[in-house]
Amino acid sequence: QAGIATVLKLHSKGDEAGQWFTDVDVSYRYDYVRDRSDSLINRKDIIDFSEIASLVDFGNNEWSNNIFKISTIASRRAPGLTTAYWVTTGNNIKFPSLQQQISQITFLDPNQQRLMPERMKSLEIGVNILTEPKEMDNIDQLELQASVFRNDYINKMRSTFLLGMPIAYFENVTLATMSGLELKAKAKTYGGKFSGEIGLSNYNISDMSAFPFKSAFKLTINTTSRWSIFTFGARLYQEGEQTGLILVPEKGFNEIELPAFSNYDLHITVDINLGFGEGQISYTGRNLKKNNISLDGLLLRDTRKYLTLSFEL
């Protein structure tokens, strides 16, 4: 694999008032990939690639691609208020690794298609507002961020797993699209003693199976509070339904649907200072709400608890 990359950055000096600033970044990358399966050194007691060469077109590839990306951000800075707008667009490519290509020899199907590079075109538009409201007591900082995006894929690489085995199988989905809206709001209050963040994601996905176990909706709430030697943190989240595929030998693909769920995490830290040294005692609990959803007998969101002690002299 070889390639070349270059980046051009343009920065404006701002307007006469020194409030508006504009940055433009342009990047270009050329990639060249060449794979040769006949140069592999394989152990014939495990598998002999020469015996399956007539069944599977594997590992002999010569790919190249040009990648362009451009992003621009315009920001306005004023006392107590900063606003930024950005637009990013471009294309990208993901070449199949040899390991991903090897997965296709799991089933010697002469009709299966060779694994092709994944190509993507993307567009994102967003805004960020950061303010320090003087008129609101005990509110140190407020931040709001919103963005919309669209990703178009050609030959989207999808991974599935063999039932009961941690073996990934890769294939291409000819066309796939994902677009959506992402919102995030943050607040710092009482001199940084309490902070909170809420995030909302809503996606429009053309084919849920092309994005295995990807939720089309997600809501998260994070809070952190500090008092004396104690730090308390909590994370609450809710996700929508998820869809994935399981590969069953001699039967093909089975679609798996996981229901929507919600759960929460807790984190507590106590600072220790004994004069001759200092440290922390921390407790972390993840997925504390009981959830019995399992896949092939394996709990997917099992409860986990950690107790950690650190001390430094």
Which sequence ranges carry the predicted segments?
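Residues on the lipid-exposed face of transmembrane beta-strands in outer-membrane beta-barrel proteins
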Residues: 4-12, 70-76, 125-129, 181-187, ...
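Signature of Gram-negative outer-membrane beta-barrel scaffolds
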Residues: 1-81
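C-terminal beta-signal and adjacent terminal beta-strands/loops
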Residues: 93-94, 155, 230, 238-247, ...
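Membrane-embedded beta-barrel scaffold of Gram-negative outer-membrane proteins
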Residues: 77-79, 84-96, 100, 117-179, ...
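Gram-negative outer-membrane beta-barrel transporters
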Residues: 31, 137-157, 167-247, 289
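Short loop/turn motifs that connect adjacent beta-strands in outer-membrane beta-barrel proteins
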Residues: 10-22, 75-83, 132-142, 190-193, ...
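Transmembrane beta-strands of outer-membrane beta-barrel proteins
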Residues: 20-26, 68-70, 83-87, 140-146, ...
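Residues that define the transmembrane beta-barrel architecture of outer-membrane proteins
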Residues: 1-2, 20, 62-68, 119-123, ...
